């Protein structure tokens, strides 16, 4: 989700989820910063599942001799609840943009010492000063992208650029649709599908989307996270998911397609933060 304007009502398709070298190198520098606090030569990274490039960790371990232990989560709420409860002993976390202010307000993440992050100045200008973290005082960019719908074209050959894929599945997909457990994205897609705006406080609109989701849920197969593999292996024929993850599924199975709902869809950015007790 990008700052105070978390949605896109597109006229044309954007690019797939982007893994920008500058962002990854900056994230690696934050790993290095956190490692300075690791007296035992270990670093605990708490990140979304199936999201961390193993090559990045291998490179970091080879260059520093510090072992990275990766623990994953499946939603922003899961990550926040676990850290807030005091569990895990993690050093780094990767919250989405709209959750960063919550982490900061709760005192769960540190203000960054920019003198130890020389490449901080190399962050692309559009990401350097953002509404959810002014001046990038607490985070550095990790990745950004969009949330949409993935469909296996062997199961369904109709229009996939619509949230009807999960809000009102066609007969071919009834009982074959997965929905990600990241409820911010699901609510954003659903609100725009019924004619509302993401982050609305309109009670009647929220009731409308609640009723629409409850009506749709019996037609779903699951609410699960690991769709990169499951879409690639035909275990699931359609899913609400993220464009980068589905692109990886498509590398294994070219029948997997990604749709950008014409009703609107969320854009997001995930950023790396150093936990207060790291």
Question: What are these regions, as identified by a protein language model?
Answer:
Residues 50-52, 76-78, 98-102, 146-147, ...:
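Solvent-exposed loop/turn segments at secondary-structure junctions
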Residues 99-102, 232, 237-255:
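A ligand-binding cleft/hinge motif common to bilobed small-molecule-binding domains
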Residues 1-19:
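Short, Lys/Arg-enriched N-terminal segments with co-localized hydrophobic residues
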Residues 122, 206-214, 250-276:
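Periplasmic-binding protein-like
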Residues 89, 94-235:
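Extracytoplasmic ligand-binding site segments that recognize negatively charged/polar headgroups
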Residues 40-102:
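Early extracytoplasmic/lumenal segment of secretory-pathway proteins
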Residues 69-71, 178, 221-222, 257-259:
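General small-molecule cofactor/ligand-binding pocket signal
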């Amino acid at each position: 989700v990008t700052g105070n304007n978390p949605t896109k009502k597109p006229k044309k398709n954007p690019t797939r989820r982007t893994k920008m070298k500058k962002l990854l190198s900056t994230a690696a520098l934050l790993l290095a910063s956190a490692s300075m606090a690791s007296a035992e030569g270990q670093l605990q990274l708490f990140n979304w599942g199936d999201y961390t490039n193993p090559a990045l960790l291998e490179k970091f371990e080879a260059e520093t001799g510090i072992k990275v232990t990766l623990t994953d989560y499946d939603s922003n709420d899961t990550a926040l609840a676990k850290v807030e409860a005091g569990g895990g002993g993690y050093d780094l976390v990767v919250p989405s943009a709209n959750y960063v202010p919550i982490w900061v307000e709760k005192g769960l993440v540190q203000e960054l010492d920019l003198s130890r992050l020389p490449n901080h100045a190399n962050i692309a200008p559009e990401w350097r000063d953002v509404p959810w973290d002014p001046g990038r005082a607490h985070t550095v960019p990790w990745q950004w992208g969009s949330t949409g719908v993935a469909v296996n074209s062997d199961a369904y050959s109709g229009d996939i650029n619509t949230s009807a894929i999960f809000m009102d599945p066609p007969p071919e997909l009834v009982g074959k649709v997965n929905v990600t457990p990241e409820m911010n994205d699901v609510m954003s897609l659903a609100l725009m599908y019924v004619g509302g705006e993401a982050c609305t406080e309109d009670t009647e609109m929220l009731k409308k989307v609640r009723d629409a989701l409850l009506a749709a849920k019996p037609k779903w197969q699951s609410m699960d996270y690991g769709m990169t593999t499951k879409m690639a292996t035909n275990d699931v024929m359609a899913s609400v998911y993220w464009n980068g993850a589905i692109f990886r599924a498509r590398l294994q199975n070219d029948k997997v397609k990604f749709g950008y709902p014409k009703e609107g869809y969320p854009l997001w950015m995930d950023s790396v933060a150093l936990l207060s007790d790291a």
